[in-house]
């Protein structure tokens, strides 16, 4: 007899179909359902299912087994480029006949100042050498943040930057270089083709499920208050013109 009505592996997907989670915007729910594997950083995939044995000449089946990586909470506050901590073993005193001891390999971290052209701000960020190489490969910090998918950024700070950049582009008339129209057009024309999305969608980029649920709750509360303010004058008019009918309706409701 099963212990649960539904298997635990689908609990997260079932949670999105009820309550306030089911009322989240469609574009945000689509991003949660996208399951793309991150780019391998600490290992190299074979890329094929079979390989020929060099000694026997026979075809052998191979399998891609990723190395378990631990991402500490500090990685969410910087840009580590997908790197993390790897736990393994090493020989004591580099002697293969000695006992193995545990070892944790950690990436080398640097603190660098990176400039965002869209936000017109310098950020002091903890990065790795791989992050700097990726920024150089796409010719700029803004391009790296906007082009890199969520699973490769693997950083809450990086997704917050992406949301801020997308909102700045969506609100270009008021927020993007308001004092310099020439620079505004130059920057906007550089990013408008691939990165401009509606403001309603940009507001949800990079939000965690808890943050999105809280945002949806506040939006629904605001809509109820606006509806109450809009209907209040009409209710006052009805009560003033036909007070006896309103009293009868209230009594019927209580009964």
Regions found by a protein language model. Give the residues of each.
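Compact, Lys/Arg-rich rRNA/RNP-binding cores from ribosome-related proteins
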Residues: 2-255
